Each structure stands twice: as structure tokens, then as C-alpha cells.
């Protein structure tokens, strides 16, 4: 059995692994549906921390936090950014089976080299490690789009 969230996560079998790693992994991405802000891409600002990157405008994460009873102040309100991130970390274990659970962990692995499952107990460590990586640069909207090979995108 493969470990959880390895490079072949969601690839069920040898054929899937060959097709993905041999062909699809290196293809350019034409993204027909996303919720990226055209204004943020134009401004191309470097985020200061993972809360700005992840929680600044992600209505999927906001909805998950609301469903978990997180006060609005900790979602879109005036709470400190680290506290918003910690609230998301506390929420995430309740999302097993929701794509956000997998997406969040895939992003931690691919962009931050963090394999630690995100939860309340690990939030401070993940916050620190992710922010150290963000401080090195390369996380502005355009830099991220180029890094993953997006050649065209359409946004809502």
C-alpha cells in the first residue's frame, strides 16, 4: 500500500502512473475554471504569510470554516492573520473526505515541502515553516502560475 499523499496519490494503478508521469505531468495547463482574482494577478503582490496566500479570498475555505462554527471575525474579519490560519488548521481534520483536505495537504507538500498533516496541534509549526518559505520569494500570483505551467486561464 502506498503512503498517504505520495507522488502517486489518486493514481490508481500502473497505467495511471505511466500516463501521468510519462505524459500529463509535463503538459501545459489551460485552466478553464478558477476563482483567481484578475486584479491580484495584475498587481502580482508577494504574500507576507500563508494566511494571505490561502485565506485571503478562498470562499471554499471560508465556507468550510463557517460550517465548523468558526466566528466570522476569524474568517473574513479583523482577527490577526496567524489566528485565522490556526482556525483553518483546527477545521481541516473535520474535512477528511472533502477535496479541501487533500488540496491543502498537496499544496503544503508541493510548494512548501511540508509533509506534516495540518491540524490544531501542528498549526504553529506549519505556519512557521510555510512563512519561512514564502519569505524566500516565488509566491506572487504570476510566479505561482508560471511554476505550475499555466499557459491560459479563465476566471469567474
Model-derived segments and spans:
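Metal-cofactor-binding active-site regions of metalloenzymes
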Residues: 1-156
Amino acid at each position: 500500500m502506498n503512503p498517504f499523499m505520495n507522488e502517486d496519490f489518486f493514481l490508481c494503478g500502473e497505467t495511471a502512473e505511466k500516463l501521468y508521469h510519462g505524459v500529463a505531468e509535463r503538459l501545459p495547463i489551460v485552466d478553464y475554471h478558477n476563482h483567481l482574482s484578475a486584479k491580484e494577478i495584475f498587481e502580482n503582490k508577494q504574500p507576507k504569510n500563508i494566511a494571505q496566500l490561502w485565506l485571503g479570498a478562498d470562499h471554499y475555505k471560508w465556507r468550510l470554516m463557517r460550517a465548523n462554527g468558526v466566528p466570522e471575525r476569524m474568517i473574513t474579519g479583523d482577527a490577526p492573520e496567524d489566528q485565522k490560519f490556526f482556525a483553518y488548521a483546527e477545521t481541516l481534520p473535520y474535512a477528511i473526505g472533502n477535496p479541501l483536505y487533500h488540496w491543502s495537504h498537496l499544496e503544503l507538500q508541493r510548494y512548501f515541502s511540508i509533509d506534516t498533516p495540518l491540524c490544531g496541534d501542528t498549526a504553529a509549526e506549519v505556519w512557521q515553516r510555510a512563512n519561512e518559505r514564502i519569505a524566500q520569494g516565488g509566491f506572487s500570483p504570476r510566479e505561482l502560475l508560471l511554476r505550475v505551467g499555466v499557459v491560459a486561464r479563465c476566471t469567474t
